[in-house]
From Swiss-Prot:
Family named by the database record: Belongs to the MEMO1 family.
Source organism of the structure: Methanobrevibacter smithii (strain ATCC 35061 / DSM 861 / OCM 144 / PS)
UniProt cross-references to InterPro entries, sorted A to Z: MEMO1_fam
Protein name in the entry: MEMO1 family protein Msm_1438
Entries under CDD domains matching the protein: MEMO_like
Highest taxon of the lineage: Archaea
Gene3D superfamilies on file: LigB-like
Coiled-coil spans in chain: none
Length: 282
């Protein structure tokens, strides 16, 4: 299965040279890390970090996403990136794993790690092989050019969550852990999520603050509780909960929020904004 770009030319440039320039601008922007890191080498099986990244158009969230990709480059790349995003289309299964083929971007093709994907599915009560959830979903696609900017020497396991429950998060985290151990492969989990949607800047800063505090405290239960209590429209809380749970299973018990902004900080329109944050679990 070849997964063609769904949002190239909209969320990011569809021309490879323009895309590279856009990514570099994200790193060098005052909201970004302020530098373009060199990619280091990584050896071994226990990759030291997992990350959280936003998934809006690069003009809005690319500078914030660059903070997490700066950390990944500094640690070197593992063999596999497991990229978990929410389901914006409503298609597919509870936990949809794109288990065979390649993903195409303007920077080249990326192979799916079919062995890791199928092994993950075999250990899960929720996950199944499914392409439908992925074909128009942007939350995973927009991460790939940032990775390809540094290297094409990696594979991916794309996972879309239709079910964002604690049960599904625990199940998926355990399945990833077991698959990694069985295959003896190094991997990093990328949780793709924006924060609150279409609030005023003042309210976004307030409710996103609740979310970010819960993430820093590595408390998936409080995160879900406050999302419900305050009606926080965070689209990818399931991927974030999964990554927090898995990180703790692997002994990565601390997290750090690297950057936070809203779309209003970029556009100047503070009446209706979306929140974006990058974070690292280590």
């Amino acid at each position: 299965m070849l997964r063609k770009p769904a949002v190239a030319g909209m969320f990011y440039p569809d021309d490879s040279e323009e895309l590279v320039k856009t990514i570099e601008d994200c790193f060098l922007h005052s909201f970004g890390p302020g530098k373009i890191p060199d990619i280091e080498s990584f050896e071994g099986n226990d990759y030291p970090v997992n990350v959280m990244v936003p998934h809006a158009g690069f003009q809005y969230s690319g500078t914030i996403a660059a903070h997490s990709y700066c950390e990944l480059a500094k640690n070197g790349f593992p063999e596999v990136f497991i990229i978990i995003g929410p389901n914006h289309t409503g298609l597919g299964s509870e936990v949809s794993v794109f288990n065979k083929g390649e993903w195409i971007t303007p920077l080249g093709n990326i192979q799916v790690d079919e062995e890791f994907a199928d092994t993950l599915i075999s250990f899960s009560d929720f996950a199944s092989a499914d392409f439908a959830a992925h074909m128009r979903e942007h939350s995973i696609e927009v991460q790939l050019p940032f990775l390809q900017y540094f290297s094409n020497d990696f594979k991916i396991v794309p996972v879309v969550l239709g079910s964002q429950t604690i049960s599904a998060a625990n199940d998926l985290a355990a399945a990833i852990l077991k698959a990694g151990e069985k295959l003896d492969k190094s991997y990093c989990v990328i949780a793709s999520s924006d924060l609150s949607h279409f609030n005023t800047q003042e309210r976004a800063n307030k409710v996103d603050g609740f979310v970010l505090e819960d993430i820093e405290n590595m408390d998936e239960f409080k995160l879900l509780e406050e999302i419900i209590q305050y009606n926080i429209t965070m689209c990818g809380y399931g991927p974030v909960m999964t990554t927090m749970i898995l990180s703790k299973m692997c002994g990565k018990n601390t997290s750090e929020i690297l950057a936070y902004k809203t779309s209003g900080d970029i556009s100047g329109d503070l009446s209706s904004v979306v929140g974006y944050a990058s974070g690292i679990f280590k």
